[in-house]
């Protein structure tokens, strides 16, 4: 969905596109082609609705933001080629990895988190792992392609690897434990090297590039240079949209899956 809001944050137009995930080789995925054709169709629908409602063409905007499904696995090599088809949050083949990491980190690591997908690929001795240059989520991927910036909003990043609330970055302790865990593999990378840079809300996350504008607007009317905010996951976006942003608040999301998001007073501890 593409939503256009005014200066008072009220929706004034929208566009949409319907897509379905595919089960390929036992794993749920969306193709790269489906991602971009869907985004272009969605933006084109928004553009048409704006022209019909207001008689104007969209050429520039105050800002753009990308939100998408959290978690999953999108590894890329140095040539910016995806190494395996996008593995979405729906995949449950990561049981061994999630259990092992939960014990190692003394922290609950769900099946869907990116670190679970990465470690499962390592446990399965998948050949592509040594070639990884960048690992990101769907929102992080789209943002990277339209701005050139390998960054991720702190909410979406927390679904890749736990965040240390004192540093607003990935847990240094967990990063070190993971690197030690896989040291015998002698991969060409360390974990911190391949993860997106973590950004808090409001931080500079780049601008729409000329190439990025063409990826969104096939008609060529959308101009480059528009600021783009840190890309976020659907859960964090939903919490902001429902004003669940303070401690002791939360919200429930019900759609493809159902989950409760809460803001704790302090870091939960294991009894």
Predicted regions located by residue number:
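Charged catalytic carboxylate motif
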Residues: 34, 38
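Short glycine-rich, Thr/Ser-proximal phosphate-binding strand/loop in the N-terminal lobe
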Residues: 1-32, 81-88
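Glycine-rich phosphate-binding/catalytic subdomain of phosphoryl-transfer
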Residues: 26-29, 41-266, 270
């Amino acid at each position: 969905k593409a939503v256009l809001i005014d200066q008072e944050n009220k929706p004034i137009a929208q566009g949409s596109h319907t897509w379905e995930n595919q089960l390929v080789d036992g794993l749920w995925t969306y193709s790269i082609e489906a991602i971009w054709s869907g985004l272009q169709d969605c933006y084109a629908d928004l553009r048409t609705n704006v022209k019909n409602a207001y008689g104007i063409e969209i050429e520039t905007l105050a800002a753009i933001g990308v939100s998408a499904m959290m978690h999953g696995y999108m590894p890329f090599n140095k040539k910016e080629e995806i190494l395996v088809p996008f593995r979405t949050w729906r995949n449950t083949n990561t049981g061994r990895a999630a259990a092992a990491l939960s014990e190692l980190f003394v922290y609950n690591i769900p099946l869907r988190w990116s670190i679970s997908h990465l470690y499962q690929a390592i446990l399965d001795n998948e050949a592509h792992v040594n070639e990884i240059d960048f690992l990101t989520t769907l929102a992080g991927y789209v943002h990277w392609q339209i701005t050139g910036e390998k960054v991720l909003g702190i909410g979406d990043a927390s679904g890749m690897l736990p965040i240390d609330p004192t540093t607003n970055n990935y847990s240094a302790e967990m990063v070190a434990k993971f690197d030690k865990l896989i040291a015998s593999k002698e991969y060409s990378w360390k974990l911190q090297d391949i993860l997106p840079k973590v950004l808090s809300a409001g931080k500079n996350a780049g601008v729409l590039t000329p190439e990025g504008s063409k990826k969104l607007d096939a008609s060529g009317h959308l101009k480059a240079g528009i600021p783009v905010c840190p890309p976020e996951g659907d859960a964090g976006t939903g919490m902001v949209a429902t004003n669940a942003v303070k401690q002791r608040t939360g919200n429930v999301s019900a759609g493809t899956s159902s989950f409760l998001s809460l803001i704790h007073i302090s870091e939960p501890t294991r009894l």
